[in-house]
């Protein structure tokens, strides 16, 4: 009887601990959604993950680096390039591209070895800022919930600004300011259309693809992005959607 009561007390304590831990995490996410709707983002969850992973591997020279800049300090071509590459419907959806999701599901049923994603810029930003890499249903479920909250509270311009400041462009290189200075020795405000398209071309896998040593695939993707940028209307597209 004593063992039963002790065991029951332990289970109740563990249950309370789990519930409280979940509530703390949810509270932290809600606070992050509110605070980062106007405050600069000092670091992201992916940056922390990369840094800790490097230390655990003994790679003490690795430093996850980013420099926050406002949208006014980012070349319009860079904002247009990431939308052309990753999410051309970004101004119009509420965080999810249902057509792209449907196409990805059909593709993945036929091609189990080459999985296609359908994440919008909003989802990618949420994953980078609050969550972790991976394709688990748990992470995707959390991503969907947080993305909904972000879309309700933030403007599209804010989502794009944060995305551009925390996106990974290479080992230890996070955000367009750090990428522009590392690869082109200039601030993000002076990036050309070609340079912007090259940076956007590595976004699917910035560890495998390098802007400073682009493969033939990256170069082809860069040229495709440039064509898409022209078809979208260039700066006029940004102005029409209040994104510049």
Curated annotation (Swiss-Prot):
Keyword Acetylation recorded: no
Keywords: Cell inner membrane, Cell membrane, Cell shape, Cell wall biogenesis/degradation, Glycosyltransferase, Membrane, Peptidoglycan synthesis, Transferase, Transmembrane, Transmembrane helix
Protein EC: 2.4.99.28
Protein topology in the membrane: Single-pass membrane protein
InterPro entries: Glyco_trans_51, Lysozyme-like_dom_sf, PBP_transglycosylase, Pep_trsgly
Molecular function in Gene Ontology: pentosyltransferase activity; peptidoglycan glycosyltransferase activity
Protein name according to UniProt: Biosynthetic peptidoglycan transglycosylase
Taxonomic source organism: Pectobacterium carotovorum subsp. carotovorum (strain PC1)
Lineage: Bacteria, Pseudomonadati, Pseudomonadota, Gammaproteobacteria, Enterobacterales
Name of the gene: mtgA
